[in-house]
């Protein structure tokens, strides 16, 4: 689904940057355990075609790097990425000033909210941002 959206936005080269937030298999209760994390499968599927940045408030940067992902601060991830993906429900991600962060991101932008942490209506203010997630058309 992500590749399809990016292709429709003409984002198909290795120049396309994806920012993945949440490497632990769950955000709450907080853990640094990445075993069986769906994020790892996602990265495996995307790494060949795109440049991947990542963030997790608990997982050490070294663990993120082991998966061929570049660790980055949240603000920098938003400013530098064509696609932003939230992969777990950590409280850090629930409390972001999402409108400000999206406003600063390159356009067009794909925002994938796998946990539906944010109301889709927030994104109505941004005609060049596509909001999607699991079970969202």
Give short role names for the model-derived ranges:
Residues 1-137:
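Structural/interface elements that position substrates and couple domains in central-metabolism enzymes
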